[in-house]
Amino acid sequence: METIRFALATALAAALTLAGCTAAGSSSTAATSGTTKASAGKPAFPPGLAHVTAYSINTDNPVLTSVVSGAISDYGPAEAVSPGSTGVSAHGSELELKLTHGTFRLNIAGIDTKFSAGTSHEPIYLRTCSTYVSVSDAVPIVPGSGTGAYQGIADTFAMTLTLNEVHNSPCTTSLSILRQVVVLSGAGKITKR
């Protein structure tokens, strides 16, 4: 159960990286409205503030749902993968966002390490047999990982990874969960190199 949850958290962390901020803990800035023309049927990729959310509900599967808004408007699955690998991995240190206009990867190793430490003593609330863990870290885009409309995408995002769940009774994490929500979210300025 912890291995699966770790993979899910890792996948979420990567997805949130796309939403990047310039520094963890920095204040949010309202995105300005703007229009950039797309060329040859491909979406425009202007530099600017992007918001990323990746989430999973009631599953520890390392495949999440992601939505990106702001400088990028796209959506698709986000999969935990190992560096250089193309297959889903329960222990992947990268999160590959497979969006409708291209893909890119987030390095979620740092936020995943913090998340694993935060969940190491589950359930956090023994009396109610529930857990709430929230950690934040900088999540960089893996250099050279962009494809399609995201070829050349770069920068680092401030992300938060949150787990909120209720465990079965008797209270143990080795049993299945009753309800679980895992959310990786953040914002940041993206650039193209």
Pin down the residues of each PLM region.
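Bacterial N-terminal signal peptides that target proteins for export
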Residues: M1-L8
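C-terminal motif of bacterial Sec signal peptides marking the signal peptidase cleavage site
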Residues: L18-G20
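Bacterial signal peptide processing site
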Residues: T22-A24
